[in-house]
Amino acid sequence: MTSSQDRDATRNGKSHLCALLLLAAMTGSTSPALAAGGDVAVVVRPETPVDNLSLSEVRKLFLGDRQFWTGSLRVTLLIRAPTSHERDVVLKTIYRMSEPQFRQYWISKVFRAEASSGPKIVYSNSMATELVLAIPGSVAFVDATEVPKGLRVVKIEGTLPGDPAYPLK
């Protein structure tokens, strides 16, 4: 190969790489499995006193009906920003609400002094997991493939992400 052919091959390789990165950015994912949207895990700190919740218990928790884990350990809800797969799953499966209904629910709940604030909005799975690690009592929904060491995945109806019966897909 001549040096001119080497340069052309390098340019073509870079062009292909740029095209792949652009495609990944447009789909919002670098993995076909993530682009399709996989299981969503409920994560807490290891010392949070919960291992397994029924779907109705998760619903009560994220509706703000349960504000303490035990004693004085307050529940801090962390939820992904609109348009994320995790938020879509949570709104459909847990809240059973549309985006406008969700916003109105929390405005009403805070206005009636039934909650001091709504869930905290997080903009990525990594932001959610970092905050769960930093805030005692916090709980979040994240892509099950992105759970870091140091967090515990809560079983839902006795199942974990990846199980065919797992409800948060």
Specify the residue positions occupied by each region the protein language model found:
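N-terminal secretory signal peptides that target proteins for export/translocation
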Residues: M1-G13
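Bacterial N-terminal signal peptides
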Residues: H16-S29
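Exported/periplasmic ABC-transporter solute-binding proteins
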Residues: A35-K169
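Extreme N-terminus of proteins, especially the signal/transit-peptide cleavage junction
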Residues: T10-G13, A33-G38
